[in-house]
Amino acid sequence: MKNKLEAEEVIKLKLVIDQDKELVENKKEAFLYGLAGGMCFDFNKFDDHLFLVGTEEGKIHLCSKAYSGQYLETYEGHYLAVYAVKWNNFHPRTFLSCSADWTIKMWDKNLNRPIMTFDLTCAVGDVEWAPYSSTVFAAVTSAGNLYVYDLKQEKHHHLCEHPAMKKAKALHVSFNKVDPIILVGDERGGVNSFKLSKSLTKGPL
């Protein structure tokens, strides 16, 4: 009986290079140039073979545990590092991403371009879907602010903006799965909790 966790390589991340870019001449440099830096990942809630990987280069890759040698799809829309990718809890094709390029983007996995973009004017460290609704999500930024959206009520603007941290970058956000509470973690190891209003805690859609 094994008493420790063992790592298993699922896929080697390869750079997706635009066709109009020049070829790298040096072989060693070409090898390094061909590897992508992974920043985040998330498994699909409805098909645990499918997962997304966000990269340092701004690309998002759809991968499968059944096909370890290639990407199923590559999504282009961010131009800086992708800090988080999150599948929707109710719709198997929908996911969110956030990036150092100041934006949150919503995607359909069958389309390689974003279907919606939200600009928060500074780096977005994390984004999270609410566990009780398909249209509510929260995000945190390097300025220390917490944003809450509900696409059913307002498709283009946040419903709530609140300073989550004082003089610290907010890095992570998480919904409590039982109570109407959001937790925000910062770069200094601090965690703050916030209670959601009733208008943002409606049941699944």
Where are the predicted features?
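Conserved strand-to-loop turn within each blade of WD40 beta-propeller repeats
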Residues: 54-57, 97-101, 140-143, 185-188
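Blade-level signature of beta-propeller repeat domains, shared across WD40, Kelch, NHL, RCC1
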Residues: 172-205
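Loop/turn segments within WD40 beta-propeller blades
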Residues: 33-35, 41-48, 67, 85-93, ...
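Inter-blade linker and blade-boundary elements of WD-repeat/beta-propeller domains
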Residues: 1-40, 61-63, 67-84, 112-126, ...
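WD40-repeat beta-propellers
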Residues: 1-3, 60-64, 104-109, 127, ...
